[in-house]
Amino acid sequence: TKFASNLHEPLGMFWKDGSLFATQRPEHTRLTDKDGDGRADSFDTICSKWGISGDYHEYAFGSDPDKNGDVWMVLCLTGSFHAHAPWRGWAAKITPEGKFIPVASGIRSPGGIGANDRGDFFYTDNQGVWNGSSSLKWLRAGSFQGNPTGNKSAALANFPTPPEPTSGSRTLAERLKFPEYVPPALILPHGKVGNSPSGVACDMSKGKFGPWESHMLIGEQTASQVQRVNLEVVNGLYQGAVFHFLGGFEAGLIPVRMDQEDGTLFIGGSNRGWGSRGSKNFTFERVRFKGKV
């Protein structure tokens, strides 16, 4: 049943207090059915503090609310080399009242965002400038994620401007120069574990999805797969390992969500604008644990 239409590429949705909340390209929106006919008739802008320039690449990915009710979001750069609008290449929180709070800089091309069982937020960043291979990154508050393109918004955030990383340098050397730099929790070998990671989910179903409690699940658009990630904290930073997990989906995977009540994994797919192993234009698929590994 259609609830709403004409949204601008929403890449993050959740229900709360009888309304549907959507992170769209230009704004975070509350959609409400006030007359009870099953269709949204009230569209309220909660926050629209970031900028867009019209470039196709300027996606906005939003999370479910955290324990404080804040929505975390990551904002793509303008293409691969520019930040033509405010807050491009940044992560931020949106409070229930609509306040925009910058959280981290240094982002390139996110494909999804989600929290682990500790409530820490992670996003997938795609291979390209300053990202030798795609990765899963921890959004520690106040951190720099490695790509300096969006540094021009640091003054707006009252953040220290990170120095330009040295091409060909090493993570340890760059962290000594700028301790706010947080290296990837996990690097995804390009071509071996896909080329374009997307949605992020965490298995907190207490065994309903199998023996992978607290593991992260990330989508892969090019290869039409789901990868499984096991993380640990060492010396205050996340690190971990990635495993091929599920394949054979019918389009490129974008959102990945788990129903923690019954352990069903829901996956949305599309090959619009980016080729994928799955050949369908749009899909909605689900995965349930059969009881065997």
PLM regions with names:
Residues 1-293:
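Beta-propeller domains with acidic blade repeats across secreted/periplasmic ectodomains
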